[in-house]
Amino acid sequence: MERRRVTSATRRSYVSSSEMVVGGRRLGPGTRLSLARMPPPLPARVDFSLAGALNSGFKETRASERAEMMELNDRFASYIEKVRFLEQQNKALAAELNQLRAKEPTKLADVYQAELRELRLRLDQLTANSARLEVERDNLAQDLGTLRQKLQDETNQRLEAENNLAAYRQEADEATLARLDLERKIESLEEEIRFLRKIHEEEVRELQEQLAQQQVHVEMDVAKPDLTAALREIRTQYEAVASSNMHEAEEWYRSKFADLNDAAARNAELLRQAKHEANDYRRQLQALTCDLESLRGTNESLERQMREQEERHAREAASYQEALARLEEEGQSLKDEMARHLQEYQDLLNVKLALDIEIATYRKLLEGEENRITIPVQTFSNLQIRETSLDTKSVSEGHLKRNIVVKTVEMRDGEVIKESKQEHKDVM
């Protein structure tokens, strides 16, 4: 934002002559004649953010003032020439008048003398009025240009302030959107963590505890800068200063043209006020610069926090993926080992079943052979025969149910005196 202070210092030119008459007054040697004008009110705001632009504007202002000063000096030199010419004519007329006075006065000479005095007085008045009107015209033209420039500067400043406000609002909206995006990412990651934890909470309880310890709650507290109030306050101050300056300008234009000594004192007071306003504007500029730096720091902090959150969530997601892959590998290895143990157990049961069948077959064969062989009855008096029968059934879902029946027969003298049956169940 560039604002230029256009100041017009009091312009003076000094003339020293032997004698001249201005406005009916005779000025002696060493008399100082100065022309001055009131400076226009200063702009309400100055921006020193761009030193280069300020220096160039200051140089242009100084150059324009120097050119105006030279033009005024040239114009005043022409006025001096006219005054000298009039002085010479005055001297000539005075010499002629002295010559006429040396002669015998007549009525015609008195008439000429009175008319001459009247003409001189009118000439002095016209000359003074002409010079005053020309100076006033130049001052009014320059003041009009200054007011137009000031109006343009005020319009540019207002547009720039509105653009800055829109930019600040856009930055605030972007920061809010970034914060909401981060919150949504955090919620999605937390839901994914809860889902993974719920799936594996029964099988891997120890991993669930580790995940619970590693859970990170992120809370972000973003300070929302109150830009609207600050800009409203600045605009209020700006409008107040602009209104005050406009009021002072109107009062100055309605007031009469003051004499040169009062103008010098007034210019000194205005210069002091200008310096004071420049200091105020410097302080305002520093405050706005601090606010801008604060907003930039807040933006950088938000971006840094966003990057840290993304990196941390990426690391956590990678660790969760690795843990999930490791658990899947462990589960697969456990399933493989369980299947291998089941297969070994099934093989052992099959071997045991085959052995039991062979034992039962041998016993039946042995009992048949014993029944065919003739043996004295006394030898079988205490004989106990144990008969074992095997009943196998297939059960659904891959389980094998086996019933083993042990039958005991007690015979004496070829007669069965006692018989018992015992059943054993085995499931595999």
From Swiss-Prot:
Which residues lie within the region annotated Linker 2? 249-252
One of the entry's Gene Ontology molecular-function terms is:
structural constituent of cytoskeleton
* UniProt KW Cytoplasm keyword: yes
Name the segments for region: Tail: 374-428
Q: Summarize the PTM comment.
A: Phosphorylated by PKN1.
- Supply the alphabetized keyword list: Citrullination, Coiled coil, Cytoplasm, Intermediate filament, Methylation, Phosphoprotein
Residues with Phosphoserine modification: S13, S34, S78, S319, S381
Subcellular location(s): the record lists: Cytoplasm
> Annotated region Linker 12: where?
211-226
Q: Provide the residue span(s) of the region labelled Head.
A: 1-68
Q: Tell me, which GO biological process terms does this entry list?
A: intermediate filament organization; regulation of chaperone-mediated autophagy
PROSITE patterns cross-referenced by the UniProt entry:
IF_ROD_1 (PS00226), IF_ROD_2 (PS51842)
Post-translational modification Phosphothreonine, affected residues: T7, T106, T146, T379
Task: Spell out the residue ranges making up region: Coil 2B.
Answer: 253-373
Residues recorded as bearing Citrulline in the entry: R26, R32, R266, R402, R412
Q: Which Pfam families match?
A: Filament, Filament_head
Q: Enumerate the residue ranges of region (Linker 1).
A: 101-111
**Assigned GO CC terms:** cell projection; cytoplasm; intermediate filament
Q: What does this protein do?
A: GFAP, a class-III intermediate filament, is a cell-specific marker that, during the development of the central nervous system, distinguishes astrocytes from other glial cells.
Q: Provide the family line.
A: Belongs to the intermediate filament family.
Subunit note? Interacts with SYNM.
State what protein this is by name. Answer: Glial fibrillary acidic protein
Q: What species is this protein from?
A: Bos taurus
Q: Which lineage is the organism of this entry classified under, starting from the top rank?
A: Eukaryota, Metazoa, Chordata, Craniata, Vertebrata
